[in-house]
């Protein structure tokens, strides 16, 4: 009798995706982040669903309803802490996943990569509207500052901003629609994840060497299910340590005060995972220029496949490109630090230099390094 998982129409899909899937035998722990992101998404949807059962999206009661969840709902404090810190874990895994893609040349699977960039943008949009929901000071002013950037668009900007707000400023209508967006977007993300996997399974996974792995494949189960389970243990351990021992360390103290349109916080800043883009936005003194730089900082990922000049796919055997990659990583950490600092010297100039270096590395230096490495590998006799 044939195994049910190989004959049943639904089980067959699961089997081909997670059990009998041929996977390269040499993929490292850097390939764990895809499954970890899937787990993060499930955690966020489940905790978010329970939070939505007790939350009210009204300017008068939103802040109180979050306090009520933490004080009166059974394990409400835990659900909220898991949801808030789960977002940080989600972005940590996302950044590492994208970094892995750049380092090992996974971006050459263009369809998978492009869907991935769309996923990144959608997750960022979801996190932004979600941060507004507790209706604390930083929620309100963060929403005001970021939505106000739309007004920099020539001719239609102000109309567009007011259309998003549902009035002449961030208010009740804005909060209600942001809650609606925050509820629906994770399901759109889930659909995009399925498309992402669909494209990935058309080509199969890349591997650290960047060489075609077809001659040496192993079944996904049990080898990589066990490996992913280990990654999951580390993820859950980190998330629980964060949520149980230091739940507010990544948040902003201003968000413990209810939103007050008459009192501006001294330093308006987003959550840590947006700080690198916020630093790039602030490094340009012109409003429209800043908005364009902000968009470019993420959308630049779409042009990376077209800037691949090296004869080798992976950076595994390309020391110059490796050096530039780690400079880029350090540069992003610098931008994250600058994004959280006040707008004064020396932070302004450091932010501007780091922003220039960010674009210079991706658009100029890394493609040149690829060409130089090709030249170095050519026989000279």
Curated annotation (Swiss-Prot):
UniProt main location, coarse: mitochondrion
BP terms from Gene Ontology: mitochondrial electron transport, ubiquinol to cytochrome c
Cofactor: heme b
Protein localization: Mitochondrion inner membrane
Additional comment: Heme 1 (or BL or b562) is low-potential and absorbs at about 562 nm, and heme 2 (or BH or b566) is high-potential and absorbs at about 566 nm.
Subunit structure, interactors included: The cytochrome bc1 complex contains 11 subunits: 3 respiratory subunits (MT-CYB, CYC1 and UQCRFS1), 2 core proteins (UQCRC1 and UQCRC2) and 6 low-molecular weight proteins (UQCRH/QCR6, UQCRB/QCR7, UQCRQ/QCR8, UQCR10/QCR9, UQCR11/QCR10 and a cleavage product of UQCRFS1). This cytochrome bc1 complex then forms a dimer.
Record's function text: Component of the ubiquinol-cytochrome c reductase complex (complex III or cytochrome b-c1 complex) that is part of the mitochondrial respiratory chain. The b-c1 complex mediates electron transfer from ubiquinol to cytochrome c. Contributes to the generation of a proton gradient across the mitochondrial membrane that is then used for ATP synthesis.
Record protein name field: Cytochrome b
Gene (UniProt): MT-CYB
């Amino acid at each position: 009798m044939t195994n049910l998982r190989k004959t049943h129409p639904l089980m067959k899909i699961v089997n081909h995706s997670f059990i009998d899937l041929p996977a390269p035998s040499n993929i490292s722990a850097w390939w764990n982040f895809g499954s970890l992101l899937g787990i993060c998404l499930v955690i966020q949807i489940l905790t978010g669903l329970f939070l939505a059962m007790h939350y009210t999206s009204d300017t008068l009661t939103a802040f109180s309803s979050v306090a009520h969840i933490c004080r009166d709902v059974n394990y409400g404090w835990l659900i909220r802490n898991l949801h808030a810190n789960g977002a940080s874990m989600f972005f940590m895994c996302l950044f590492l996943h994208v970094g892995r893609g750049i380092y090992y040349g996974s971006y050459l699977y263009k369809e998978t990569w492009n869907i991935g960039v769309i996923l990144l943008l959608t997750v960022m949009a979801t996190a932004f509207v979600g941060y507004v929901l507790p209706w604390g000071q930083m929620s309100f002013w963060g929403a005001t500052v970021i939505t106000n950037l739309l007004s920099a668009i020539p001719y239609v900007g102000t109309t567009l901003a007011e259309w998003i707000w549902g009035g002449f400023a961030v208010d009740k209508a804005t909060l209600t629609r942001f809650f609606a967006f925050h509820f629906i977007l994770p399901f759109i993300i889930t659909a995009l994840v399925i498309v992402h996997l669909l494209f990935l399974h058309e080509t199969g996974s890349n591997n650290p060497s960047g060489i075609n792995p077809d001659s040496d494949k192993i079944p996904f189960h049990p080898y990589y299910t066990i490996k992913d389970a280990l990654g999951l243990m580390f993820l859950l351990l980190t998330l629980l340590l964060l949520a149980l021992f230091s739940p507010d360390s990544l948040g902003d103290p201003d968000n413990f005060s209810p939103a007050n349109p008459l009192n501006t916080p001294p330093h308006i800043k987003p959550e840590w995972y947006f700080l690198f883009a916020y630093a790039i936005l602030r490094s340009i003194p012109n409003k429209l220029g800043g908005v364009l730089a902000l968009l470019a900082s993420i959308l630049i990922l779409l042009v990376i496949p077209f800037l691949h000049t090296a004869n080798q796919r992976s950076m595994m055997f390309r020391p110059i490109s490796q050096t530039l990659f780690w400079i880029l990583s350090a540069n992003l950490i610098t931008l994250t630090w600058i994004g959280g600092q006040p707008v004064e010297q020396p932070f302004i100039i450091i932010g501007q230099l780091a922003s220039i270096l960010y674009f210079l590395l991706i658009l100029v230096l890394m493609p040149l390094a690829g060409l130089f490495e090709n030249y170095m590998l050519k026989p000279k006799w």
